């Protein structure tokens, strides 16, 4: 680690103060849900487009190393979408249970 990469202490404290002031803001559950959903939707769309572009490129499909990378990306995408689906289903089930009681 070089000396140039060490951050001055007052810069870190200034960032911590900024973080604390943001934590006191009141955010509704609906807003948090919308922010999480929109961020997830954008990330998923970008990942899907990246995978589609890789599959449509003939140079990447014929190279075994690139094909393995594409397969790994598809696997990661599949796992992520499955996880989001499961968490959404569980969340909806929990809310329905709370509303019934």
Swiss-Prot record:
Signal peptide coordinates: none
The entry's keywords: Protein transport, Transport, Virulence
Database matches in InterPro entries: T3SS_SctI-like (IPR047754)
Highest rank taxon of the organism: Bacteria
TM regions (residue ranges): none
GO biological process terms held by the UniProt record: protein transport
Family to which this protein belongs: To S.flexneri MxiI.
Role, per record: Required for invasion of epithelial cells.
Protein name according to UniProt: Protein PrgJ
Native organism: Salmonella typhimurium (strain LT2 / SGSC1412 / ATCC 700720)
């Amino acid at each position: 680690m070089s000396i140039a990469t060490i951050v001055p202490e007052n810069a870190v404290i200034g960032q911590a103060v900024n973080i604390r002031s943001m934590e006191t803001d009141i955010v509704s559950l609906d807003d948090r849900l919308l922010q999480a959903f929109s961020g997830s939707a954008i990330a998923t769309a970008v990942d899907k487009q990246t995978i589609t572009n890789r599959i449509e490129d003939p140079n990447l499909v014929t190279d075994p190393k690139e094909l393995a990378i594409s397969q790994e990306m598809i696997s990661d995408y599949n796992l992520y979408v499955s996880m989001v689906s499961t968490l959404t289903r569980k969340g909806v089930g929990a809310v329905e249970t709370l509303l019934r009681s």
